[in-house]
Amino acid sequence: MKNERLIGAWRKILQMKPENPTIEICPGITRRTVANGETMYQMLATLAAGSRMPEHSHSQEQIVHILEGKMRLIVDGVPHELSNGDSFYLASNVPHGVETLSATRVLDTFSPPRKDYLAIDEKVRQEVL
């Protein structure tokens, strides 16, 4: 019974992924929802070389894992250079920004979920229909 529940959840994630749109967050930076649940949200972000995410903050905690590329994370005015395989954690409401040093792909996980992003996904899906 326990395995059936896990398999059902896994199927839901696999079925959801293909319908998620790619959304531009800001020039040169796109995101695509990978999965979400009641307490977490995960997305794949693609950042063009030289792109910049201005300083911002959000109420969610965030964990970022760099899949490929190189970026400069700026927290409290202090730059941190990160590359393939690096991960970092940001607490709620911590101002941060990013500058890419090469084309970069990251896996972002937020808790609680980014309901704002999910609402945009749904709006885009409805516009396509």
PLM feature spans:
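Structural motif
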Residues: 63, 70-72, 79, 95, ...
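Short acidic-glycine-tyrosine-enriched beta hairpin
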Residues: 77-92
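A cytosolic small-molecule/anion-sensing beta-strand core signal
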Residues: 67-68, 83, 102
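Ligand-binding loop in jelly-roll beta-barrel domains
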Residues: 92-116
